[in-house]
Amino acid sequence: MFRSLFRPTVVVAALALGIPALASGTVMRHLKLVRSFPAADTALATSPEKITIELSEAVELTGSKLTLAKEGGAPIALAALRREPTATKVLRADVTTALSSGGYVVSWRTMSKDGHVVKGTFGFRVGAAK
């Protein structure tokens, strides 16, 4: 008697736990940073004209933010954040003043179409690498 009740219970439990786990591989994906310009941890010879981030899926401009700061310093003003016209996965902000030599940190925050907020940071250098 015990053995005959045990098997269906195990099968039901395995299905209940296994199906959502399999589905989460496709349903629960979150957007992530694919690439940036400047690329993380690179040194540029001259000041960049723009900062861009490319994400793994389309993003909402509302609620998105991109900030630039000199390492250990105050934020540096950027032009208004926008999506690239032909690429809904790319956010761009133009650099309005030439950056001096040194290290910089880019912080970003955005939201996917399904409402998940994702954020990150990366650094780059202008001028000779240390």
Give the location of each predicted region.
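A short tyrosine-centered beta-strand micro-motif
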Residues: 104-106
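Proline/serine/threonine-rich low-complexity linkers at boundaries of modular beta-sandwich domains
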Residues: 22-34
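Beta-strand-rich extracellular modules
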Residues: 109-113
